[in-house]
Amino acid sequence: MKKLVLIVLVALFSVQLMAQRVPSEKKMSISAGVLQGGGGLVGADFEFMLGNHFSAQAGIGLTSFGAGINYHFKPFINSSMISLLYWHQGIGNTYTQALLGPVYTFRAPKVFQFQIGLGAKVGEGPKIPEANKNVPLMLLYSIGVYFPL
């Protein structure tokens, strides 16, 4: 009887033990969502690791494009990061503004991400709204999903 109780207890405790999460070995990712790819209504970004903590990204959205350099807090593509991003909103006659600034990106261990930061205006186009003409800083934000490749 003691052996049976001991076996049951060992089995119960062994089920509860969990190993450490294995970090992603993937070195690239694609993200898509609202205000991704340079701040377009919808867009996508392609990101690739340059080294242990650094990565680069480039993206395109609905009449927008952007690029950036990122520093990941952990040396994995699926970790949160801080970035220096360039957003170019509008193309040709629809060009509104170009922004450059720091952004914090939160990445959940799987799929979900969001960004928030500030962008300094480095260019204005013919379609910039009158209310934004004298505003030197703009809030940069986006929400979406990412998929390590």
Regions of interest found by a model, annotated:
Residues 24, 50-52, 73-77, 106-112, ...:
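Outer-membrane beta-barrel strand-turn architecture
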Residues 64-66, 97-99, 138-142:
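Short hydrophobic/aromatic beta-strand or adjacent loop that forms the aromatic wall/cage
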